[in-house]
C-alpha cells in the first residue's frame, strides 16, 4: 500500500536555474517544489541537455515565452513520488521527461497520423500544469513550467502523460539526450520521412538534430547523404556520423539548391532544414526532385517569419512538411530507441562534447554558441 504524505511533508526546497526575465543569465537558487497532484509525477532530474530551444525562449524571441520560468526539456532521472491515479510509472523508475505527451485518447493520438497530443496542449503552452497552476515557487513568486518538463531543476513535476519509463541500464547522461535533439533528427529521417533505400538526402545544419538525421539516413540505407553547413568545422562531424558529402554554401559559385540538383541528377529525394532560417527552408524545398521530392522543416523560425516559394515548386510535385520530436511517440516508441542505443544501433555518446554542473549552467549556453559544441550535458545532482 502506498504511504500518503501530506502536502507540507512533501514540499521540497531544491536548487534550480531560474529565468527571471528574457535575455538575462539564469539564476541558480532555491525553489520550492510542490508535491504531485492527481495524474502528476515528481522526478529527481539527474541529467539534462541544453537545447537551442531553451536558448531561443531565453532570448525573448519566442512568442510563447513567458517569465519567470524554469527552462529545460531534455532531461532524465528517477521518479520520486506520484500523485493519485498514476499507473504508467512508479517510484524508483528511471524515466525521460516528454515535451510531446501521449495520452492515447485525444483525437490526435487516436488518428494514427501524428505524434502530437492535444490533451494538455493549452495549459502546457501557458507554462502551467493541467489544473492551471504551477508546482514551483521562489522569492514568494510562482514560477512557470517550460514545455511541460522544466528539467533545469533538481526536482520537477510533470503530467503522467509527459513521462516514460525506460530501462535503468541506460545511464541518464545518455538517455536525457533522447528527450529532444537526437530523437528529433533520427525520427525525422526514420519515421516522418521514412527514407527509402538508395534515396539522395540533403541535411541543412550540422548540429545535434542534423547529425541525428544523418544517422537516421544511414540506418535507412540512403544513397548520397549531403550535409550543408556554413561552418567548415562541421565537415568532420558530418563524415563521422556517416555523411557522404559536405557543402559550405559560402564556397559555392552557384546557389546551394542548384549545386544539390547537379549532384543528385535532378534533385534530392529528401531534404531537411534544421536551421530555423526561412531562406534556407526555401532552398531546401527547391533542392528537391521534381515529382516526388520531400522537404521536412524541423528548425523553428523566429516569431513573425514566413516561408515563401513559387507555387509551381509545389504544383510540380514537391512536398513541404514539418515534424516535432521527429514524429516519434514518446511513451510508446521512445523506449525502443533506448534499447537501440544499448544494442549499439544508435549513437548517443558521440554527441556529447561538453559537460557542466547546475552551478555552471550559464556556461553551457555560451558553449552552445560555439561551433565545436554539439551537445552539453548538465549534471543536476547538487552535492
From Swiss-Prot:
Name of the encoding gene: FDH1
Protein name from the UniProt record: S-(hydroxymethyl)glutathione dehydrogenase
Alphabetical UniProt keywords: Metal-binding, NAD, Oxidoreductase, Zinc
Amino acids binding Zn(2+) 1: 51, 73-74, 180
Binding annotation for NAD(+): 52, 205-210, 229, 298-300
Cofactor annotation: Zn(2+)
CDD domains xrefs: alcohol_DH_class_III
Origin: domain of life: Eukaryota
Functional summary from the UniProt entry: Oxidizes long-chain alcohols and, in the presence of glutathione, is able to oxidize formaldehyde. Also acts as a S-nitroso-glutathione reductase by catalyzing the NADH-dependent reduction of S-nitrosoglutathione, thereby regulating protein S-nitrosylation.
Binding residue positions for Zn(2+) 2: 103, 106, 109, 117
Catalysed reactions, as listed in the record: a primary alcohol + NAD(+) = an aldehyde + NADH + H(+); a secondary alcohol + NAD(+) = a ketone + NADH + H(+); S-(hydroxymethyl)glutathione + NADP(+) = S-formylglutathione + NADPH + H(+); S-(hydroxymethyl)glutathione + NAD(+) = S-formylglutathione + NADH + H(+)
SUPFAM superfamilies (UniProt xref): GroES-like, NAD(P)-binding Rossmann-fold domains
Gene3D superfamilies to which the protein is assigned, alphabetical: Medium-chain alcohol dehydrogenases, catalytic domain, NAD(P)-binding Rossmann-like Domain
Family label: Belongs to the zinc-containing alcohol dehydrogenase family. Class-III subfamily.
Disulfide bridge map: none
A Gene Ontology biological process term: formaldehyde catabolic process
Cofactor note: Binds 2 Zn(2+) ions per subunit.
GO MF annotations, alphabetized: alcohol dehydrogenase (NAD+) activity; S-(hydroxymethyl)glutathione dehydrogenase (NAD+) activity; S-(hydroxymethyl)glutathione dehydrogenase (NADP+) activity; S-nitrosoglutathione reductase (NADH) activity; zinc ion binding
A Gene Ontology cellular-component term: cytosol
Xref: NCBIfam families: adh_III_F_hyde
Known EC number: 1.1.1.284, 1.1.1.1, 1.1.1.-
Pfam families on file: ADH_N, ADH_zinc_N
InterPro entries attached to this UniProt entry: ADH-like_C, ADH-like_N, ADH_3, ADH_Zn_CS, GroES-like_sf, NAD(P)-bd_dom_sf
Amino acid at each position: 500500500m502506498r504511504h500518503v504524505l501530506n502536502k507540507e511533508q512533501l514540499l521540497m526546497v531544491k536548487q534550480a536555474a531560474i529565468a527571471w526575465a528574457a535575455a538575462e543569465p539564469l539564476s541558480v537558487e532555491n525553489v520550492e517544489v510542490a508535491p504531485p497532484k492527481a495524474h502528476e509525477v515528481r522526478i529527481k532530474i539527474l541529467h539534462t541537455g541544453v537545447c537551442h530551444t531553451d536558448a531561443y525562449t531565453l532570448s525573448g524571441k519566442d512568442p510563447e515565452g513567458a517569465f519567470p520560468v524554469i527552462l529545460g526539456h531534455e532531461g532524465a532521472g528517477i521518479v520520486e513520488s506520484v500523485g493519485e491515479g498514476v499507473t504508467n510509472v512508479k517510484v524508483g523508475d528511471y524515466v525521460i521527461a516528454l515535451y510531446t505527451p501521449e495520452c492515447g485518447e485525444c483525437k490526435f493520438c487516436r488518428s494514427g497520423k501524428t505524434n502530437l497530443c492535444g490533451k494538455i496542449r493549452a495549459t502546457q503552452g501557458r507554462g502551467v500544469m493541467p489544473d492551471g497552476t504551477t508546482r514551483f515557487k521562489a522569492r514568494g513568486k510562482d514560477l512557470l513550467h517550460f514545455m511541460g518538463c522544466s528539467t533545469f531543476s533538481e526536482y520537477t513535476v510533470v503530467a503522467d502523460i509527459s513521462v516514460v519509463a525506460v530501462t535503468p541500464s541506460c545511464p541518464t547522461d545518455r538517455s536525457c539526450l533522447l528527450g529532444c535533439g537526437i530523437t528529433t533528427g533520427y525520427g525525422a529521417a526514420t519515421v516522418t520521412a521514412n527514407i527509402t533505400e538508395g534515396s539522395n538526402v540533403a541535411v541543412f545544419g550540422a548540429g545535434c538534430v542534423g547529425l541525428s538525421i544523418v544517422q537516421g539516413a544511414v540506418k535507412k540505407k540512403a544513397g548520397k547523404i549531403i550535409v550543408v553547413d556554413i561552418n567548415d568545422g562541421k565537415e568532420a562531424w558530418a563524415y563521422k556520423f556517416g555523411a557522404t558529402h559536405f557543402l559550405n554554401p559560402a564556397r559555392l559559385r552557384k546557389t546551394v539548391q542548384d549545386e544539390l540538383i547537379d549532384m543528385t541528377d535532378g534533385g534530392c529525394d529528401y531534404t531537411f532544414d534544421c536551421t530555423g532560417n526561412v531562406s534556407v527552408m526555401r532552398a531546401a524545398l527547391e533542392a528537391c526532385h521534381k515529382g516526388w521530392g520531400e522537404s521536412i522543416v524541423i528548425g523553428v523560425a523566429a516569431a513573425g517569419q514566413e516561408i515563401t516559394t513559387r507555387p509551381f515548386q509545389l504544383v510540380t510535385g514537391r512536398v513541404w512538411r514539418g515534424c516535432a520530436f521527429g514524429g516519434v511517440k514518446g511513451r510508446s516508441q521512445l523506449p525502443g530507441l533506448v534499447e537501440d542505443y544499448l544494442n549499439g544501433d544508435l549513437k548517443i555518446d558521440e554527441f556529447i562534447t561538453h559537460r557542466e554542473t547546475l552551478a555552471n549552467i550559464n556556461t553551457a549556453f555560451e558553449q552552445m554558441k560555439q561551433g565545436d559544441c554539439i551537445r552539453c550535458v548538465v549534471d543536476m545532482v547538487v552535492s
